[in-house]
């Protein structure tokens, strides 16, 4: 079991993207930073907002890339490379079209599933896809032509409340995730639904 050393929250930078569905991962990391009582600070050399806390004597770094979504890998690779963090010690939180709001699931490895942030991270890590993912359901608009506007839009309050609940569920299995106990984390998280 490899302990998590880096938790990444994907999103787009700038106030026009704040609270959009595509920024669900960034929202998770913001909530995690708040729960740990730490601030996220802009670090130009990592192309993102960075924070750090200690868990059982080990550093855990938080990162929200300030690149656009399709360049997220630039930020992840810069920080992971500097601190020599292997892909299997990275957790990436991101929005997931194929799950309804209120559902959060963990996954290890796999493809990008059409998600541009994941696509770039895989490419920038040298086609290594063994990192872990926290998939935060945002639902699907119904037709592929509507996806771009949907993910870049803000969810109605009822959907946002479901997303917030799924983030709470994910924060509830943080100890298992940090320890690298993915089986236990999945059992606990996947049994919950808002």
Swiss-Prot record:
Reactions catalysed according to its record: an N-acyl-L-alpha-aminoacyl-tRNA + H2O = an N-acyl-L-amino acid + a tRNA + H(+)
Q: Where is this site: Discriminates between blocked and unblocked aminoacyl-tRNA?
A: 12
Q: Which parts of the sequence are marked as the site Stabilizes the basic form of H active site to accept a proton?
A: 95
Write down the EC number. 3.1.1.29
Provide the binding site for tRNA.
Answer: 17, 68, 70, 116
Instruction: Supply the InterPro entries for this chain.
Output: Pept_tRNA_hydro, Pept_tRNA_hydro_CS, Pept_tRNA_hydro_sf
Q: Where is the active site?
A: 22 (proton acceptor)
Pfam families given for it? Pept_tRNA_hydro (PF01195)
Its BP terms in the Gene Ontology are: protein quality control for misfolded or incompletely synthesized proteins; rescue of stalled ribosome
Record-level GO cellular component terms: cytoplasm
Alphabetically sorted, this entry's keywords are: Cytoplasm, Hydrolase, RNA-binding, tRNA-binding
Question: Tell me, what is one Gene Ontology molecular-function annotation carried by this entry?
Answer: tRNA binding
Subcellular location per the Swiss-Prot or TrEMBL entry? Cytoplasm
- Superkingdom to which the source organism belongs: Bacteria
Q: Which PROSITE patterns match?
A: PEPT_TRNA_HYDROL_1 (PS01195), PEPT_TRNA_HYDROL_2 (PS01196)
Complex formation:
Monomer.
What family does the Swiss-Prot or TrEMBL record give for this protein? Belongs to the PTH family.
Cited function? Hydrolyzes ribosome-free peptidyl-tRNAs (with 1 or more amino acids incorporated), which drop off the ribosome during protein synthesis, or as a result of ribosome stalling. Catalyzes the release of premature peptidyl moieties from peptidyl-tRNA molecules trapped in stalled 50S ribosomal subunits, and thus maintains levels of free tRNAs and 50S ribosomes.
Q: What is this protein called?
A: Peptidyl-tRNA hydrolase
Species of origin reads: Pseudomonas paraeruginosa (strain DSM 24068 / PA7) (Pseudomonas aeruginosa (strain PA7))
What is the organism lineage in this UniProt record?
Bacteria, Pseudomonadati, Pseudomonadota, Gammaproteobacteria, Pseudomonadales
